[in-house]
């Protein structure tokens, strides 16, 4: 039993020192002040008199009185809610000062400065966090003045979340600076508290089963037997930990501590005899302690894959890496990862004998394994040749070697296995001499991409009996050389990871060498072996692999330096020794075709085969061209026999269909082989280019016609003539003119080996022609051997339409100039003038007739589906701004309502009593300037409301689409065929007008204001509403651009008028048509055109059509009496009225005035558009008869008054913004015009043109009785009563003047001028000269 130790504690009163007395007294006063301050803060009332609040008569509610209220208000103003922590901080400071007495000998000013910085950081960040995240308290900011400054500074830069994160980080740093606590310790403390809480909540303690183990049960039995109480394991461990802590504390003063460091970092085992162990007062070291357990702590946990615990020495992996590097050099940068494969029993693997044996060199360890060439008699150790078999990692598993043949190692035969010796270092390939050239080997048994797998096997030597692999009990713990081993292993793993994964190969059968590498066969034998191949296609494919193996060479031995290995991403390729690569001339001398030449031949055959496939269907033109080509060929053949050209060789051609089919199959197989192996380019191969085709030595030396084909299909035998050196001239190889419609594909009558024929031996210059003929090719037109596969214009020759002169001229052997292929002549000149884009709006294009009676709305651009919502908050702000700006001008007004539209927003102002609306109208420009807007329009009177409107443009303008205006009930339900849409008003409602009720329309606006777009919108509206029998158009377009797009629609009465004289005749015809319609309506007793058409329809329903009452037998060629028919409305559209007035003269004004006065009832309506709204163009007579007007943006208020008789148009925004003054209304309405694109106009026009052609009325633009209407009356008008007398007077006086006629007959000036104009029209007097005088042309009267 243990005894409890007790101690008597007698408290005695001791006197304090003077300094201590003063300190404790001050601490007590400060603590009381903190309590008082807390009471003042908690009882704060905003109504108390304070620093920010002045109150005199109210009682003070604060518990601290007036000072407390004042101090609390100040603290809340400065710190916000953080003021509540100030009393707590004061009390904590007092406690800290009382606990820590002045026992230190010195003051650490650096620590004090760090604490001050931490305090400032905590105060500032706490206030900032409160200002950002907490709610305000009373009328103070939550963070006080300090927090407000920080939050306003951080909000624009980091936003609230970013500012909070930054302040939290600074707060954490400040806490560490102030307290000196590490956040790791804080986290551990918090975790401990949390676990204590959780264990307490679960009614358990953390020490219940912590130290319960088997030893305690053993202790019970020991107590029963021995009767001696043993110490628990927990107590022993705690005592050992305290001992170690004490030793660490005495380390700097105890010299034996430095011996401990030397023992720890010396690399020796701690359980050796000579080592000094330290224990706590003789207690034995714990077997679980890592530092004092020696090798017992890790003895049972052996890991053979651990580089530190696998039992091998440090230098052993370095030697293994060196051996692996040597094997890698032997394989010549194989595409497979480096590996060690265990031997396969029962199989004889192919041994990859390295050309150079390497050995590990002991020395200073570096980052890379150091290797050096081995001596001649060196025998590698078995453990280097066959390292740890049990350590095959997944990336070191045996994989087959699948690479190009240039990467294959040299396999040894069975005989070579027996004679293999360790000291043999015979090189497998030596650098060629000047006379010996390297020759690639055409492999015949295996494809070029599947070499046999090479399995590494140790050299068959007897191991030394004295060496045995042993595993140490435990590796050293503190060898720094193990870092080098780890780096070497990582480098090997990295090289294995970056190498591609090859295809698996069966390993159940032994791999035997089937082929030999290129250096084992002499160059002559290689050529003979290649020539002995019987299949051209197979030999061509294998020759491509052999040519690809050109850069592969083995390493030479005998003092050669170690290979320079490139380390990086991808397979490690060793740099071979310097060898001389065979040149193109040498390859050509052995009959080996270059890869570029074979590719060109295969592509040419592919193009020829494509022409076979595409030339199945022949048109009449192609058949005719073929016939002409056959005639030209026969003529050329006759010329050849005539002049005795005998340079055509005896080339045997296959003439039967079976041979042609066989050649086609061979060509297709060659193309497939080329496509299959075209992607496998060796490392040293150059890409194909046209420069390779112009290599003249190859053309001189290459035997293009060997006795046995090497790499071409063997179905076409070729002869071998004498070769003549011909200098190629590639600049003469001009392709045929690229006209695909006249191309003639090659006919498969006989195979055409023009790409295999030799060059021309006789003519010094090559003769060029088309390489494809329908029958046997002629030599004089045969194209020389030029592989031009990459250029399609050389692969697709064309047959001419007519025989060309070069086919008719005989060949001149002595002519120094070559004959050129003339380009084909273009088609006939009259055919080239027919172009669809030159047709007037594409009249000749065939169109599909629509099935709907009217065009569909799908032809128009649909409006966007998402509409931007109205920002009411921004409108409210603008309303307050308008009120403020009006107040600046001493105008008191309130914004009572606003109407947002697509372009503008109208604010309705309620003016104060006595304020005139004219004051706001006069301030429109000043308001626009003060509101920072483009323009402001003041609406003095809003119908139905006692307010004044102020129209301001929107910040984001919306587009009004014609489709959404046409697709509304107001337009669809209007029965009038003359219904037009204008756009949308300021409220967004569509504005629809009826041209029959206008009855005429005047449109004016400057260039770019949207005038032409508005006219197009009105025309399209009528095209979407009326059939051609309902509405007809007469369009006058002086600019020949705006209305000419409507040419060809069935609504036109005549073609679009672009000549101004024809425009005057069209207006004159309109006046005559108006008079005729009035006569017919008067005969039927109706008042307008609608009543007339109703009468005609009623008569048709009765079956009794109405005859024409004014027809006479001589008026027409009709046998029967013509009947009256339905009359359509006629809309006369003039795009540029000012140009018409300037060109034709004053007569047009009279015609327009007559139409404007009387044409409404006759169904004839005018739409006049002009961009110059001046008084001389829009006269008072026209304005009086055209009440409906549309004003777009104009330049001045004068122009606005010319159009609308009031201002406002100068304040419009442009781009379709208009003021529409409707019929029977004096107040214009602001409308935003519908936007119409040119594509929409063309689509609707094409739709109507597909429905039918226009039925033009003759005689509208021509007048035989007038000279074009250039200012005179037409022949149908009666002459003046005084005309004869005036003619007599002028011819007698020989002087023609308006004033003279006026004085003579005492008439008015206008009548005298009209008489003179009639004389000019009759040819009696001439036109006015430059001085205003007229010359009398008629002779004087006879007396």
Curated annotation (Swiss-Prot):
Residues 357-475, 556-586, 600-619, 633-863, 1256-1275 are annotated as: Disordered. One of its GO terms (biological process) is chromosome segregation. The keyword Cell inner membrane applies. Residues 988-1201 form the FtsK domain. GO terms for cellular component: plasma membrane. Pfam families: FtsK_4TM (PF13491), FtsK_alpha (PF17854), FtsK_gamma (PF09397), FtsK_SpoIIIE (PF01580). Residues 45-74, 133-162 are periplasmic. CDD domains: TrwB_TraG_TraD_VirD4 (cd01127). Disulfide bonds: none annotated. NCBIfam families: PRK10263.1 (NF007615). Consists of an N-terminal domain, which is sufficient for the localization to the septal ring and is required for cell division, followed by a linker domain, and a C-terminal domain, which forms the translocation motor involved in chromosome segregation. The C-terminal domain can be further subdivided into alpha, beta and gamma subdomains. The alpha and beta subdomains multimerise to produce a hexameric ring, contain the nucleotide binding motif and form the DNA pump. This is DNA translocase FtsK. The gene is ftsK.
């Amino acid at each position: 039993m243990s005894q409890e130790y007790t101690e008597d504690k007698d408290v005695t009163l001791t006197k304090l020192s003077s300094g201590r007395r003063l300190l404790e007294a001050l601490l007590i006063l400060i603590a009381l002040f903190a309590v008082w301050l807390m009471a003042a803060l908690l009882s704060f009332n905003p109504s108390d008199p304070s620093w920010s609040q002045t109150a005199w008569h109210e009682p003070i509610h604060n518990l601290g009185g007036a000072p407390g209220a004042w101090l609390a208000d100040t603290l809340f103003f400065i710190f916000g809610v953080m003021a509540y922590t100030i009393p707590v901080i004061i009390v904590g400071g007092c406690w800290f000062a009382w606990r820590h007495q002045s026992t230190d000998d010195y003051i650490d000013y650096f620590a004090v400065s760090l604490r001050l910085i931490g305090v400032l950081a905590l105060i500032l960040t706490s206030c900032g966090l409160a200002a950002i995240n907490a709610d305000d308290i009373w009328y103070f900011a939550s963070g006080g003045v300090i927090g407000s400054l920080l939050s306003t500074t951080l909000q624009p830069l980091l936003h609230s979340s970013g500012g909070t994160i930054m302040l939290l980080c600074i707060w954490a740093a400040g806490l560490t600076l102030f307290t000196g606590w590490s956040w790791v310790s804080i986290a551990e403390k918090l975790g401990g508290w949390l676990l204590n809480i959780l264990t307490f909540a679960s009614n358990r303690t953390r020490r219940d089963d912590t130290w319960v183990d088997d030893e305690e049960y053993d202790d019970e039995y020991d107590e029963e037997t021995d009767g001696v109480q043993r110490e628990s394991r927990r107590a022993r461990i705690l005592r050992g930990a305290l001992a170690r802590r004490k030793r660490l504390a005495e380390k700097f003063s105890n010299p034996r501590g430095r011996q401990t460091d030397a023992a720890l970092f010396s690399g020796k085992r701690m359980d050796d005899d000579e080592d000094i162990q330290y224990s706590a007062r003789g207690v034995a070291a714990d077997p679980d302690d890592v530092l004092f357990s020696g090798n017992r702590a890790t003895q049972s946990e052996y890991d053979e894959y651990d580089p530190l615990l696998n039992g091998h020495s440090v230098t052993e992996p370095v030697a293994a890496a060196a051996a692996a590097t040597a094997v890698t050099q032997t394989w010549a940068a194989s595409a497979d990862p480096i590996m060690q494969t265990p031997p396969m029993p029962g199989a004889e693997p192919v041994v990859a004998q390295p050309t150079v044996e390497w050995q590990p060199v002991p020395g200073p360890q570096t980052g890379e394994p150091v290797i050096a060439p081995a001596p001649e008699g060196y025998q590698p150790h078995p453990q280097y040749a066959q390292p740890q078999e049990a350590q095959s990692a997944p990336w070191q598993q045996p994989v087959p070697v699948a690479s190009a043949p240039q990467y294959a190692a040299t396999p040894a035969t069975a005989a070579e296995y027996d004679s293999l010796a360790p000291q043999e270092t015979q090189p497998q390939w030596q650098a060629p001499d000047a006379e010996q050239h390297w020759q690639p080997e055409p492999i015949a048994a295996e494809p070029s991409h599947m070499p046999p797998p090479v399995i590494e096997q140790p050299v068959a030597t007897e191991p030394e009996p004295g060496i045995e692999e042993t595993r140490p009990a435990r590796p050293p713990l503190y060898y720094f050389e193990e870092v080098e081993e780890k780096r070497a292993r990582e480098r090997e793993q990295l090289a294995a990871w970056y190498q591609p994964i090859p295809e698996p190969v069966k390993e159940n059968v032994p791999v035997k060498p089937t082929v030999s590498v290129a250096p084992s066969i002499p160059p002559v034998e290689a050529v003979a072996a290649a020539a002995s191949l019987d299949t051209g296609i197979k030999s061509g494919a294998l020759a491509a692999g052999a040519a690809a193996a050109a850069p592969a060479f083995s390493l030479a031995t005998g003092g050669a330096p170690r290979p320079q290995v490139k380390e990086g991403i991808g397979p490690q390729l060793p740099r071979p020794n310097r060898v001389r690569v065979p040149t193109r001339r040498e390859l050509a001398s052995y009959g080996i075709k270059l890869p570029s030449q074979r590719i060109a031949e295969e592509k040419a055959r592919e193009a020829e085969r494509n022409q076979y496939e595409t030339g199945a269907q022949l048109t009449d033109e192609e058949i005719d061209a073929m016939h002409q080509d056959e005639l030209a060929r026969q003529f050329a053949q006759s010329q050849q026999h005539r002049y005795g050209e005998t340079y055509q060789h005896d080339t045997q051609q296959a003439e039967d269909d079976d041979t042609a089919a066989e050649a086609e199959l061979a060509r297709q197989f060659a193309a497939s082989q080329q496509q299959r192996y075209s992607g496998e380019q060796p490392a040293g191969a150059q890409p194909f280019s046209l420069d390779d085709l112009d290599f003249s030595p190859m053309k001189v030396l290459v035997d293009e016609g060997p006795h046995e084909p090497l790499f071409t299909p063997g179905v076409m035998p070729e002869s071998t003539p004498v070769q003549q050196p011909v200098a190629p001239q590639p600049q003469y190889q001009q392709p045929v003119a690229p006209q695909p419609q006249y191309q003639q594909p090659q006919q498969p009558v006989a195979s055409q080996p023009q790409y295999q024929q030799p060059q021309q031996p006789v003519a010094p210059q090559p003769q060029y022609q088309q390489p494809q003929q329908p029958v046997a090719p002629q030599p004089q037109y045969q194209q020389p051997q030029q592989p031009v596969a990459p250029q399609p214009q050389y692969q697709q020759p064309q047959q001419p339409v007519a025989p060309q002169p070069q086919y008719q001229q005989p060949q001149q052997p002595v002519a120094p100039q070559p004959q050129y292929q003339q380009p084909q002549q273009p088609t006939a000149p009259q055919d080239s003038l027919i172009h669809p884009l030159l047709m007037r709006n594409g009249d000749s294009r065939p169109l599909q007739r629509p099935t709907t009676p009217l065009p569909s709305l799908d032809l128009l651009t649909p409006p966007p589906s998402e509409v931007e919502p109205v920002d009411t908050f921004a409108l409210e702000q603008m309303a307050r701004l308008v009120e403020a700006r009006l107040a600046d001008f001493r105008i008191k007004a309130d914004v009572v309502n606003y109407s947002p539209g697509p372009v503008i927003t109208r604010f309705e102002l309620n003016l104060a009593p006595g304020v005139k609306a004219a004051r706001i109208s006069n301030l429109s420009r000043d308001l626009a300037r003060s509101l920072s807007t483009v323009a402001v329009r003041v609406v003095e009177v809003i119908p139905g409301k006692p307010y004044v409107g102020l129209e301001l443009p929107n910040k984001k303008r919306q587009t009004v689409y014609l489709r959404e205006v046409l697709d509304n009930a107001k337009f669809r339900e209007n029965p009038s065929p003359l219904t037009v849409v204008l756009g949308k008003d300021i409220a967004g409602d569509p504005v629809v007008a009826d041209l029959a009720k206008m009855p005429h329309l005047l449109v004016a606006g400057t260039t770019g204001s949207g005038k032409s777009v508005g006219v197009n919108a009105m025309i399209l509206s009528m095209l979407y509403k009326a059939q051609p029998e309902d509405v007809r158009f007469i369009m006058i377009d002086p600019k020949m651009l705006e209305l000419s797009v409507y040419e060809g629609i069935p609504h036109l009465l005549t073609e679009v008028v672009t000549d101004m004289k024809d425009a005057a005749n069209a207006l004159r015809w309109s006046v005559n048509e108006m008079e005729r319609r009035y006569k017919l309506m008067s005969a039927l007793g109706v008042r307008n055109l609608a009543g007339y058409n109703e009468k005609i329809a009623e008569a048709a329903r009765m079956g009794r059509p109405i005859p024409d009452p004014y027809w006479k037998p001589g008026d027409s060629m009709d046998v029967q009496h013509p009947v009256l028919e339905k009359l359509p409305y006629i809309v006369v559209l003039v795009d540029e009225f000012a140009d018409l007035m300037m060109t034709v003269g004053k007569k047009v004004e009279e015609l327009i005035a007559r139409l404007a006065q009387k044409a409404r009832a006759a169904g004839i309506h005018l739409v006049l558009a002009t961009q110059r709204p001046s008084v001389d163009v829009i006269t008072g007579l026209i304005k009086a008869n055209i009440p409906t007007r549309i004003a777009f943006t104009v330049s001045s208020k004068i122009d606005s008054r010319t159009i609308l008789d009031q201002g406002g148009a100068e304040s419009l925004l442009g781009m379709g913004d208009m003021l529409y003054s409707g019929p029977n209304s004096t107040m214009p309405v602001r409308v935003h015009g519908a936007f119409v694109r040119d594509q929409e106009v063309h689509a609707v026009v094409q739709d109507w043109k597909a429905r039918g052609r226009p039925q033009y009325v003759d005689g509208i633009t021509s007048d035989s009785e007038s000279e074009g209407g250039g200012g005179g009356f037409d022949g149908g008008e009666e002459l003046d009563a005084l005309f004869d007398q005036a003619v007599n007077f002028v011819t007698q006086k020989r002087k023609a003047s308006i004033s003279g006629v006026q004085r003579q007959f005492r008439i008015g000036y206008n009548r005298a001028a009209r008489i003179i104009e009639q004389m000019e029209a009759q040819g009696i007097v001439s036109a006015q000269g430059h001085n205003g005088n007229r010359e009398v042309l008629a002779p004087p009267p006879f007396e």
